[in-house]
Curated annotation (Swiss-Prot):
GO terms for cellular component: acetyl-CoA carboxylase complex. Its EC number is 2.1.3.15. This is Acetyl-coenzyme A carboxylase carboxyl transferase subunit alpha. Acetyl-CoA carboxylase is a heterohexamer composed of biotin carboxyl carrier protein (AccB), biotin carboxylase (AccC) and two subunits each of ACCase subunit alpha (AccA) and ACCase subunit beta (AccD). Component of the acetyl coenzyme A carboxylase (ACC) complex. First, biotin carboxylase catalyzes the carboxylation of biotin on its carrier protein (BCCP) and then the CO(2) group is transferred by the carboxyltransferase to acetyl-CoA to form malonyl-CoA. Residues 36-286 form the CoA carboxyltransferase C-terminal domain. NCBIfam families: accA, AccA_sub, PRK05724.1. It catalyses: N(6)-carboxybiotinyl-L-lysyl-[protein] + acetyl-CoA = N(6)-biotinyl-L-lysyl-[protein] + malonyl-CoA. Transmembrane segments: none annotated.
Length: 312
């Protein structure tokens, strides 16, 4: 059963009317209602607030990494373990083909249903997850395979065990190693891009965000609690943090924004998956045609955080 957010109530009402028209066999009413639905969707989604975009990024029906992998990756083979400690189910690694292009895919997976969410640790990776991702990146480099990374996490797991096993070191090592990989790398934020937990698999030649995703150094709720000691200031924090694709593109922190279906990826995962596939293939061709892509990646990373101070 579809889940609707509060600002989608009118969409839900019209959708229910369409279903009733289908039951009655009233094609004329169905056609009228579908036109009304399209108009309502355009009206709502063209005027979303940043807080509503945050809600969409976290929508329970939003496609996760495994949804996209199942739809776009063929002849796939999953790889487990980090060769150091354990296998972290919050990060999934696959070898397969996207339109007959051999590729390594690394994704952060939140899981669906209570049992699977617990297995995936709600998409919050431990150090062994990031080390597994690095292992696969080195595999891709050895066999000259491009890498697609699907980012979707509230953040790296902050548990005591994770810290004892070197959470910060594992993330830092990934930043260092992914920056110098000798194969094309493409990272897409498909939902939440939370802090270092997201950044650990977001260092790439091309960094893109889905239209209704977010990328932030801390959750807006956490920011509000720290700065104002008031979690109700979340909407204020969102505006101050600039976490939406549009804001981050304007700041030069991401390369591209991937448009979603008219009702969002959570209403049409098949179209969203096809868009991701096409973006990956186009970006890969662009990178492969550039003999200086390694230098360009380095220069892009080195330019982050630079600023010019003017004296009046």
């Amino acid at each position: 059963m579809a889940i609707y957010l509060d600002f989608e109530n009118h969409i839900k009402e019209i959708q229910n009317e369409i279903e009733l028209a289908l039951i009655r066999g009233d094609e004329d009413a169905k056609e009228i209602l579908e036109k009304r639905l399209d108009k309502e969707v355009k009206s709502i989604y063209s005027n979303l607030t940043d807080f509503q975009k945050l809600q969409l990024a976290r929508h329970p029906d939003r496609p996760y990494a495994m949804d996209y992998i199942d739809l776009i990756l063929k002849d796939k083979y999953e790889v487990f373990g980090d060769r150091h400690y354990n296998d972290d189910k919050a990060i999934v690694c696959f070898i397969g083909k996207i339109d007959n292009v051999p590729v390594v895919v690394i994704g952060e997976e939140k899981g669906r249903g209570t049992k699977n969410k617990l297995l995936r640790n709600f998409g919050m990776p431990n150090p062994c997850g990031y080390r597994k991702a690095l292992k696969m990146a080195k595999f891709a480099e050895k066999f000259n395979l491009p890498i697609l990374m699907l980012v979707d996490t509230a953040g790296a797991y902050p548990g005591i065990g994770a810290e004892e096993r070197g959470q910060s070191e594992a993330i830092a090592k990934n930043l260092q190693e992914f920056a110098s990989l000798k194969v094309p790398t493409i990272s897409i934020i498909i939902g939440e891009g939370g802090s270092g937990g997201a950044l650990a698999i977001a260092v790439a030649d091309k960094l893109a965000m889905m239209e209704y995703s977010i990328f932030s150094v801390i959750s807006p709720e956490g920011c509000a609690a720290i700065l104002w000691d008031d979690p109700s200031k979340t909407e204020v924090a969102i505006k101050a943090m600039k976490i939406t694709p549009r804001d981050l593109k304007e700041a030069g922190l991401i390369d591209d924004i991937i448009l979603e279906p008219s009702k969002g990826a959570h209403r049409d995962k098949f179209s969203a998956a096809n868009t991701i596939k096409e973006y990956f293939l186009d970006a890969l061709r662009t990178i492969q045609q550039d003999p200086h892509f390694l230098d360009n990646r380095y220069q892009k990373l080195m330019s982050l955080g630079s600023f010019v101070e003017s004296m009046n």
